[in-house]
Design a protein with these regions (language model features):
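Adenosine-phosphate binding glycine-rich loop
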Residues: 28-135
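Rossmann-like NAD(P)-binding element
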Residues: 1-30, 34-35
């Protein structure tokens, strides 16, 4: 089972995690207080836990995405940032993470200078393909 939250603090309990399938994944990204704290999620049996906070291991935060997405959109003067562009950025991010870097405790570095460069071309190509690029 997978939980991806960007909702409200404390809405997931350890007891809820215990009802999930083995090796559950929880991305509790509500800020500043996550849906469940990492220690509580692990106590419930979660295998992978990430939050949006830099003071917990395995931070997953939108701060990682903004620079690359906006740079790519600005460079082609995109009139919109559409779903296709976001998917292109997501795929580029997934390709950036090596097997050696990926672990249960670290999906990727919270601030990674490679991200913006990795996303530029796929994002720009997607903007052009979907007709939102003006350059």
């Amino acid at each position: 089972d997978v939980f991806i939250g960007v909702s409200a603090p404390g809405v997931v309990t350890t007891e809820m995690v215990k009802t999930m399938n083995q090796d559950a994944i929880l991305f509790a990204c509500a800020n500043p207080t996550p849906e469940i704290f990492p220690d509580d999620a692990k106590a419930g049996g979660a295998r992978v836990v990430a939050t949006g906070r830099s003071d917990f291991p395995n931070q997953i935060n939108n701060v990682l995405a903004f620079p690359g997405i906006f740079r790519g959109a600005f460079d082609v003067r995109a009139k919109d940032i559409n779903d296709e562009m976001k998917l292109a950025a997501s795929r580029a991010l997934a390709e950036l993470i090596t097997d050696e870097e990926l672990s249960e405790d670290t999906s990727f570095r919270s601030i990674d200078p490679r991200v913006g460069r990795q996303w530029l071309l796929p994002l720009q190509m997607s903007a052009r393909k979907t007709g939102v690029a003006r350059l």
